[in-house]
Amino acid sequence: MRLALVQYAPAGNAPEANAARILQLYREAAEQGAALAVFPELALTDADAGALLRRRDYRERCAAAVRELAAASGDCGLVFGAPLEDGEGRIYNCLLFAAGGELLHCHQQLLLPFDAAGRDRRFFSPGSELS
Protein backbone atom coordinates (compact mmCIF):
# COMPACT_ATOMS: atom_id res chain seq x y z
CA MET A 1 0.00 0.00 0.00
CA ARG A 2 1.36 3.41 -0.96
CA LEU A 3 0.59 6.24 1.45
CA ALA A 4 0.91 9.96 0.81
CA LEU A 5 1.64 11.92 3.98
CA VAL A 6 0.90 15.47 2.92
CA GLN A 7 2.23 18.52 4.75
CA TYR A 8 1.09 21.90 3.53
CA ALA A 9 0.52 25.37 4.92
CA PRO A 10 -3.20 26.20 5.10
CA ALA A 11 -4.24 29.53 3.59
CA GLY A 12 -5.10 31.00 6.96
CA ASN A 13 -8.63 30.34 8.06
CA ALA A 14 -10.22 30.09 4.61
CA PRO A 15 -11.92 26.68 4.46
CA GLU A 16 -12.86 27.03 0.78
CA ALA A 17 -9.29 27.87 -0.30
CA ASN A 18 -7.88 25.14 1.92
CA ALA A 19 -10.36 22.58 0.55
CA ALA A 20 -9.29 23.49 -3.00
CA ARG A 21 -5.61 23.04 -2.10
CA ILE A 22 -6.30 19.76 -0.26
CA LEU A 23 -8.21 18.50 -3.29
CA GLN A 24 -5.37 19.47 -5.65
CA LEU A 25 -2.75 17.70 -3.49
CA TYR A 26 -5.08 14.72 -2.99
CA ARG A 27 -5.50 14.30 -6.75
CA GLU A 28 -1.73 14.52 -7.26
CA ALA A 29 -1.22 11.80 -4.64
CA ALA A 30 -3.86 9.59 -6.26
CA GLU A 31 -2.29 10.08 -9.71
CA GLN A 32 1.04 8.97 -8.25
CA GLY A 33 -0.50 5.74 -7.03
CA ALA A 34 -1.32 6.50 -3.40
CA ALA A 35 -4.03 4.34 -1.86
CA LEU A 36 -4.43 6.79 1.02
CA ALA A 37 -3.61 10.51 1.33
CA VAL A 38 -3.25 11.77 4.91
CA PHE A 39 -3.38 15.49 5.72
CA PRO A 40 -2.65 17.21 9.07
CA GLU A 41 -4.87 17.99 12.01
CA LEU A 42 -7.14 20.96 11.24
CA ALA A 43 -5.90 20.99 7.64
CA LEU A 44 -9.15 22.62 6.57
CA THR A 45 -8.85 25.68 8.79
CA ASP A 46 -5.39 26.06 10.32
CA ALA A 47 -4.70 25.46 13.97
CA ASP A 48 -5.42 29.08 14.89
CA ALA A 49 -9.06 29.26 13.81
CA GLY A 50 -9.86 30.13 17.41
CA ALA A 51 -12.60 32.71 17.82
CA LEU A 52 -13.82 32.17 14.24
CA LEU A 53 -15.21 28.85 15.43
CA ARG A 54 -17.74 30.75 17.53
CA ARG A 55 -19.32 32.12 14.36
CA ARG A 56 -22.08 29.93 12.94
CA ASP A 57 -21.42 31.08 9.36
CA TYR A 58 -17.78 30.00 9.65
CA ARG A 59 -18.74 26.58 11.05
CA GLU A 60 -21.23 26.18 8.18
CA ARG A 61 -18.50 27.04 5.66
CA CYS A 62 -16.29 24.38 7.24
CA ALA A 63 -19.07 21.78 7.07
CA ALA A 64 -19.72 22.62 3.40
CA ALA A 65 -16.01 22.22 2.61
CA VAL A 66 -15.99 18.83 4.36
CA ARG A 67 -18.94 17.70 2.24
CA GLU A 68 -17.20 18.95 -0.91
CA LEU A 69 -14.00 17.04 -0.10
CA ALA A 70 -15.89 13.86 0.74
CA ALA A 71 -17.87 14.05 -2.51
CA ALA A 72 -14.65 14.53 -4.51
CA SER A 73 -12.89 11.54 -2.92
CA GLY A 74 -12.32 8.50 -5.08
CA ASP A 75 -10.60 5.14 -4.79
CA CYS A 76 -7.71 6.78 -2.95
CA GLY A 77 -8.78 7.33 0.65
CA LEU A 78 -8.65 10.86 2.04
CA VAL A 79 -7.85 11.59 5.70
CA PHE A 80 -7.90 15.18 6.96
CA GLY A 81 -8.68 17.25 10.01
CA ALA A 82 -11.48 19.78 10.39
CA PRO A 83 -13.65 21.36 13.06
CA LEU A 84 -17.22 20.07 13.03
CA GLU A 85 -20.25 20.92 15.10
CA ASP A 86 -22.72 18.39 16.43
CA GLY A 87 -26.45 19.05 16.57
CA GLU A 88 -26.19 20.52 20.06
CA GLY A 89 -23.70 23.31 19.41
CA ARG A 90 -20.55 21.51 20.54
CA ILE A 91 -17.52 21.86 18.26
CA TYR A 92 -15.06 19.00 17.87
CA ASN A 93 -11.58 18.75 16.42
CA CYS A 94 -12.26 15.87 14.02
CA LEU A 95 -10.22 13.43 11.98
CA LEU A 96 -12.23 12.53 8.88
CA PHE A 97 -11.95 9.64 6.43
CA ALA A 98 -13.57 9.82 2.99
CA ALA A 99 -13.43 7.53 -0.03
CA GLY A 100 -15.64 6.71 -2.97
CA GLY A 101 -17.42 10.05 -2.77
CA GLU A 102 -18.58 9.53 0.82
CA LEU A 103 -17.60 10.59 4.31
CA LEU A 104 -17.04 7.20 5.91
CA HIS A 105 -15.82 8.09 9.37
CA CYS A 106 -15.47 11.00 11.78
CA HIS A 107 -13.38 10.66 14.94
CA GLN A 108 -13.71 13.40 17.55
CA GLN A 109 -10.49 14.16 19.44
CA LEU A 110 -10.81 12.72 22.93
CA LEU A 111 -7.93 14.34 24.79
CA LEU A 112 -7.53 18.05 24.32
CA PRO A 113 -3.97 19.21 24.98
CA PHE A 114 -3.48 22.15 27.25
CA ASP A 115 -1.26 25.00 26.18
CA ALA A 116 -0.64 28.28 27.98
CA ALA A 117 -3.57 29.93 26.20
CA GLY A 118 -5.92 27.00 26.84
CA ARG A 119 -6.70 27.21 23.12
CA ASP A 120 -8.04 23.72 22.46
CA ARG A 121 -10.19 23.67 25.57
CA ARG A 122 -11.69 27.10 24.88
CA PHE A 123 -12.92 26.23 21.41
CA PHE A 124 -13.37 22.45 21.26
CA SER A 125 -15.34 19.90 23.25
CA PRO A 126 -13.67 16.55 23.90
CA GLY A 127 -15.09 13.54 22.10
CA SER A 128 -16.75 10.92 24.28
CA GLU A 129 -15.68 7.62 22.75
CA LEU A 130 -12.92 6.00 20.76
CA SER A 131 -14.16 5.36 17.27
Question: Where in this protein do the model-derived segments appear?
Answer:
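Enzyme catalytic cores with a strong preference for nitrogen-chemistry domains
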Residues: 1-131
